[in-house]
Amino acid sequence: MSLESYMNQIGQQARAASRLLAKASTKQKNMALFAMAEALENARPRLVEENAKDMENGRAKGLDSALLDRLLLDDKRIDGMIEGLKQVASLPDPIGEISDMVYLPSGIQRGQMRVPLGVIGIIYESRPNVTIDAASLCLKSGNATILRGGSEAFYSNQAIAEAVTAGVVAAGLPEHAVQVLNTTDREAVGKLISMPEFVDVIVPRGGKGLIERISKDARVPVIKHLDGNCHVYIDDEADLDKAFAIAMNAKTRRYGVCNAMESLLVHASVAGDILPKLVFALQEKGVSLVGCDQVRSVSGEIGAATEEDWYTEYLAPKLSIKIVANMDEAIAHINKYGSHHTDAIVSQNYTKARAFMTEVDSSSVMVNASTSFADGFEYGFGAEIGISTDKIHARGPVGLLGLTSQKYVVLGDGHTRDN
């Protein structure tokens, strides 16, 4: 079978499955999730065995230690996948909820019903556990899924797919509710993002290059998660003890995550009080620092920040620092250089905090809290499929609700409209 025929078949199967999933009961979907968890447990030896092939191939190709770590499937990570399925099963099912039902002057009632998007294509790299994250969220939200994992995780993903299908079928749901492409041909990605007749939305998870390419070439709407160039602004009316704790947590909790602080902005009037202490603590943690001329004059031996630094998501123990004259300058800097992901203000002034929340154009805006809280679990959504930096359709952490839409429903009793 040609690649085009294969992809068309996958698309047709997904579309047919989506019609059945849209009317599946919450009980049936939860049964499938628990059955998937049981199938993963039973397949544990096979998962480890197939992952070993991917790890061996990865080492042969010279993948670095960070990529190999993402690729690894050990007992702890398999336990995490199983627990993740059970957590998604415990989440409220949004499908079928009717809200904003009102009587109108004509006598009809109008409301909105929560419905699935339909068929979701998910393209991702390296981490095989994403296969379970994506499959579980899409299934619970009533969507059929076509998954295209990275070629480096091919054997792991195929083994996971077998367990997923076994669980879905055991619960009486359509066999093709979740499909993992069984080809490493890169042309499959191009086809997947060009099938609007079968696919309703694409969710890419991976590096900036992958996401930009898909966004540019797709003929299907894309929910994208681009850079996490996150800022913390320390205001002149900040509690400096809180500011110190927030800045340290936002930067050093984890370096390689999208909600880590990459740039620190400090009001000029408090820079001399907090920067020397912060710089020392960050350098003690091994963080490489670059800053503007004012920062360097206050804080001693740190590198000079370039224009490129202000735009950069380091995903590493590195931080850029800038002193600003006021909050307006901080907001202008964030809106120019930031990635619209997550930005924070530390201030005891309510009016300033409100203005910052209103004017900063990001998917999450924090007041007196670390950027590290930008996360589906921390927001009470349960699992997430990513953090969208778009404004349409979903924005911020994308959980079950972000994988749904709404349609209007109208109730009448023989009502007709006058001419």
Swiss-Prot record:
Pathway: Amino-acid biosynthesis; L-proline biosynthesis; L-glutamate 5-semialdehyde from L-glutamate: step 2/2. PROSITE patterns: PROA (PS01223). It is found in: Cytoplasm. It comes from Marinomonas sp. (strain MWYL1). GO terms for cellular component: cytoplasm. Its main location: cytoplasm. Belongs to the gamma-glutamyl phosphate reductase family. It comes from the Bacteria. One of its GO terms (molecular function) is NADP binding. This is Gamma-glutamyl phosphate reductase. Keywords: Amino-acid biosynthesis, Cytoplasm, NADP, Oxidoreductase, Proline biosynthesis.
